Design a protein with these regions (language model features):
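Juxtamembrane intracellular "pre-TM" segments in multi-pass secondary transporters
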Residues: 19-47
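A late C-terminal transmembrane helix in Major Facilitator Superfamily
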Residues: 182-217
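C-terminal membrane-cytosol helix-exit motif in multi-pass small-molecule transporters
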Residues: 1-25, 233-240
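Intracellular juxtamembrane helix-capping segments at the cytosolic ends
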Residues: 169-184
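Interfacial helix-cap and linker-helix signal at transmembrane-aqueous boundaries
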Residues: 69-70, 125-126, 209-217, 221
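Structural signature of the two symmetry-related core transmembrane helices
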Residues: 133-148
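Extracytoplasmic gate region of multi-pass secondary transporters
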Residues: 36-109
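Helix-to-loop junctions at the C-terminal end of transmembrane segments
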Residues: 117-131, 212-213
Length: 252
């Protein structure tokens, strides 16, 4: 609530742009620049909301990945005996992991490699595919991955989780850039408001932990990341209409 209150105050305050002369940009000379108050520009406001949900999803997935992988790949029966997924065992022996937790950590490291690959490949793909459509497509991919994770198919669901990082890779920069489009001299204060949306990352882990403890299952707590990935999907699909509404608000 504090973050929202601060944003609400600053969105109506005219702050000086110290680089305005250097940039040589003027809202009066560029019809593409939106001069309406930020609060009246839906592509920006919903961009902040989308970033909030996405960051919550990203931090939640990062925080609970190792625990989920261990629970899904290593099944314990009532007697306490364990049944470990063959691929999990093979991967651990291949890397010389000292214990199952180390193996799970190596899997998350592989996921980080996918994240880096996705960031570069996503930037290249965005040259031929509209960024909003690419964002929506990646959001759909991650939603499907999380649904498989929530299905909790023993020895199987953990295999798809690392690919979540591949499709998360472009989300933050794409949402950030799309929400700041055509804001002109308001871009700086708008960017500051966007950065405040990362507070979502502080909210998801406690809620996911509560769900996991309440239902005695790591799988159920991934419903929060699912919601977080649906948000970029909807934002990407609706983006052209949102931008058009912002343009009309600026012209009014």
């Amino acid at each position: 609530f504090v973050v929202l209150a601060v944003f609400a105050v600053f969105s109506f305050i005219k702050l000086p742009d110290i680089d305005a002369e250097d940039q040589g940009e003027s809202a009066a000379d560029d019809v593409s620049v939106h001069t309406a108050p930020l609060i009246r520009q839906p592509h920006f406001i919903l961009g902040i909301a989308t970033q909030f949900f996405y960051i919550a999803a990203q931090v939640g997935v990062n925080a609970f990945a190792v625990n989920y992988i261990l629970e899904n790949a290593i099944v314990r029966d009532a007697s306490g005996a364990t049944d470990t997924a063959p691929l999990f065992t093979w991967y651990g022996s291949l890397l010389g992991a000292a214990n199952p937790k180390a193996t799970a950590a190596y899997i998350v490291t592989f996921a980080m490699v996918l994240y880096a690959f996705g960031r570069f490949s996503g930037a290249a793909i965005a040259r031929v595919v509209k960024p909003n459509l690419l964002l929506a497509f990646y959001g759909i991919d991650n939603s499907l991955i999380i649904l498989l994770v929530m299905a909790d198919i023993k020895h199987v669901s953990w295999l798809v989780l690392p690919f979540c990082w591949l499709f998360m890779s472009i989300m933050f920069p794409f949402i950030f850039a799309m929400s700041l489009r055509n804001l002109g001299e308001r871009t700086k204060i708008a960017a500051s408001a966007q950065i405040m949306s990362i507070v979502g990352g502080a909210i998801a882990p406690p809620l996911m932990g509560w769900l996991a403890d309440s239902y005695h299952s790591m799988a159920i707590c991934f419903i929060l990341p699912l919601l977080g990935f649906i948000a970029p999907t909807l934002y990407g699909l609706a983006y052209p209409r949102l931008l058009e509404k912002s343009t009309r608000a600026a012209a009014a």
